[in-house]
């Protein structure tokens, strides 16, 4: 506790301030100076003794949901202890504080609600936005995660229950990326809900109204974002879990106005490209020489596809050639240029009609996932559909028929929505597939051999991107910055050093984030999106911003 902090809070006010509370770790001198004598048990503990007790209590709970609620209670009581506990048990606790458990927490948000965290910007309060933002407990906000709760993971419209996602994401910004919780703020836009179960639930805590749409929605979001910029002009804004109809349009509208990005589109794309680059080392085949098949052609799938195209182009092939190697399949079959009602972001990825003729597929039926596998012979299969079991034995065996080491990535969250289970993929390919999933899965043992399953988790990317952006004081997040994050992640793959894991273990996530932060910051400077700084100074800035879960020594300021 060498670092000193001067504060005014005392007594129960101090104990009820999660960012400052130390609980049983307050020293005797602090207990006297801050009117805490008698408010705490006599024994003075270290933070590691507190962690031991907290972990023992955590281990007593049986269900993941109970553990999630317990950890959230610690977060709302003592944030330093919370993050110290998370950091010491990151691999065990990440699935509890975020996917897959956070999905259930969002569904049950109103039932398990205990204490306020973050801001709720309700359409009913649209004339009070400035006042609401001024009510935020954290005044020096640097990173904001914002959602409207309409597309929570694969679970659909959860209304204000979607607040669980920004809370969880920002916990990972801190646990993985070292961004002080003091500088983070979760926000949910309460624009109503179309979830009839929530509207009829007497416990639902949000605005009981069908979702606003059209100009009303666009104007409200615009008002909110501009109010946020006036309040915190340099804050990084991460869009999270907006529905397909809004996600891409919002990104396109604001990415050149604000320091912002969409994690579902760009973060998922970045970690996927990083994972594919790592897999390319294992297969010995450059990404630009591979064919990639997508199941799912929404904003997330197309965002990943465009990032793959950009990486292929950076390896020396033309955009036209790269697009010809990427195949998008949705519920109506493979995207074709002649299809009516293609969305703007789908059109560049649609294949020409001549391909149907070349493959000799009759005009009156859709081109299925299996059709593409049998005719295009892809190297990579990526799932972003939320359709469990979509990658069945026939699909996986067809992938392996013409590809010695197919890369299969069922990325849908939560676990209940995954397109295929890793153990099935490996069994159907006799252990030859390279598997990465969006949700956490245990290692698979097949024929006496252990196969680690890489979790293609955005937490490998966005914490480092955030740290890099705020350390460089960048005013934009560019696709090139995210591409640099992908390349950096791939360079840290244990496979480069003879290991059998695609991605670094989560126990090394802070080191990964720091390396990504430096490369992202350098790219921001190179592109003129941040003021010029040397690499040495950027490293110093990363060190200055990086927050460690340890207690400070308190000195009292007279009220």
UniProtKB/Swiss-Prot annotation:
Required co-factor?
Mg(2+); Mn(2+)
Q: How is the cofactor bound?
A: Divalent metal cations. Prefers magnesium or manganese.
Pfam family of the protein (one)? Malic_M
Q: Which residues form the active site?
A: 98, 169
Reactions catalysed according to its record: (S)-malate + NAD(+) = pyruvate + CO2 + NADH; oxaloacetate + H(+) = pyruvate + CO2
| Entry-linked Gene3D superfamilies | Malic enzyme, N-terminal domain, NAD(P)-binding Rossmann-like Domain
Alphabetical UniProt keywords: Metal-binding, NAD, Oxidoreductase
InterPro entries referenced in this protein's UniProt entry, alphabetically: Aminoacid_DH-like_N_sf (IPR046346), Malic_enzyme_CS (IPR015884), Malic_N_dom (IPR012301), Malic_N_dom_sf (IPR037062), Malic_NAD-bd (IPR012302), Malic_OxRdtase (IPR001891), NAD(P)-bd_dom_sf (IPR036291), NAD_malic_enz_proteobac (IPR023667)
- Which residues participate in a divalent metal cation binding? 240-241, 264
Q: Does the keyword Metal-binding apply?
A: yes
PANTHER family the UniProt entry points to: MALIC ENZYME-RELATED (PTHR23406), NAD-DEPENDENT MALIC ENZYME, MITOCHONDRIAL (PTHR23406:SF34)
What the record says about family reads: Belongs to the malic enzymes family.
Q: Which HAMAP family match?
A: NAD_malic_enz (MF_01619)
| Name of the protein this chain belongs to | NAD-dependent malic enzyme 2
């Amino acid at each position: 506790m060498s670092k000193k902090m001067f504060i005014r809070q005392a007594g129960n006010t101090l104990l009820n301030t999660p960012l400052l509370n130390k609980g049983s770790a307050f020293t005797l001198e602090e207990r006297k100076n801050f009117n805490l004598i008698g408010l705490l048990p006599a024994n003075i503990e270290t933070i590691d003794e507190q962690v031991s007790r907290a972990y023992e209590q955590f281990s007593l709970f049986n269900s993941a949901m109970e553990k999630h609620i317990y950890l959230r209670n610690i977060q709302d009581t003592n944030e330093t202890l919370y993050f110290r506990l998370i950091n010491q048990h990151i691999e065990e606790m990440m699935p509890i504080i975020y996917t897959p458990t956070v999905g259930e927490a969002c569904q049950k948000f109103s039932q398990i609600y205990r204490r306020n965290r973050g801001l709720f910007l309700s359409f009913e309060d649209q004339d009070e936005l400035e006042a609401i933002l001024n009510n935020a407990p954290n005044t020096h906000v640097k990173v904001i995660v914002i959602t409207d709760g309409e597309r929570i993971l694969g679970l659909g419209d959860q209304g204000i229950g979607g607040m669980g996602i920004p809370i969880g994401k920002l916990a990972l910004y801190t646990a993985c990326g070292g961004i002080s919780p003091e500088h983070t703020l979760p926000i949910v836009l309460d624009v109503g809900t179309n979830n009839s179960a929530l509207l009829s639930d007497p416990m639902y805590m949000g605005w009981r109204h069908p979702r606003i749409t059209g100009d009303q929605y666009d104007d409200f979001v615009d008002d909110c974002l501009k109010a946020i910029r006036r309040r915190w002009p340099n804050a990084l804004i991460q869009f999270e879990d907006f529905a397909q109809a809004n996600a891409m349009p919002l990104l396109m509208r604001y990415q050149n106005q604000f320091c912002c990005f969409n994690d579902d589109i760009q973060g998922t794309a970045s970690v996927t490209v990083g994972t594919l680059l790592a897999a390319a080392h294992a297969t010995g085949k450059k990404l630009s020489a591979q064919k990639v098949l997508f199941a799912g052609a929404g904003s997330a799938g197309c965002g990943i596809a465009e990032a793959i195209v950009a990486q292929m182009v950076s390896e020396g092939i033309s955009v036209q050639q790269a697009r010809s190697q990427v195949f998008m399949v949705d519920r109506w079959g493979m995207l074709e240029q002649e299809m009516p009602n293609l969305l703007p972001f789908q059109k560049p990825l649609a294949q020409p009609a001549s391909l149907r003729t070349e493959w000799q597929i009759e005009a009156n039926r859709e081109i299925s996932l299996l059709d593409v596998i049998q005719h295009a012979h892809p190297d990579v299969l990526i799932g972003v559909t939320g359709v469990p079991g979509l990658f069945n034995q026939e699909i996986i065996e067809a992938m392996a028929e013409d590809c010695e080491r197919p890369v299969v990535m069922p990325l849908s969250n939560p676990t209940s929505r995954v397109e295929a289970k890793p153990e099935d993929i490996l069994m159907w390919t006799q252990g030859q597939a390279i598997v990465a999933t969006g949700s956490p899965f245990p290692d698979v043992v097949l024929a006496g051999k252990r196969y680690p399953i890489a979790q293609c988790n955005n937490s490998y990317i966005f914490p480092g991107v955030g740290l890099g952006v705020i350390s460089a004081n960048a005013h934009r997040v560019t696709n090139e910055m995210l591409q640099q994050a992908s390349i950096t992640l791939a360079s840290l793959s244990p496979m480069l050093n003879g290991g059998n894991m695609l991605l670094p273990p989560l126990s090394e996530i802070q080191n990964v984030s720091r390396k990504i932060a430096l490369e992202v910051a350098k790219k921001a400077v190179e592109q003129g999106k941040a003021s010029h700084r040397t690499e040495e100074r950027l490293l110093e800035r990363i060190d200055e911003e990086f927050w460690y879960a340890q207690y400070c020594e308190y000195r009292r300021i007279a009220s």
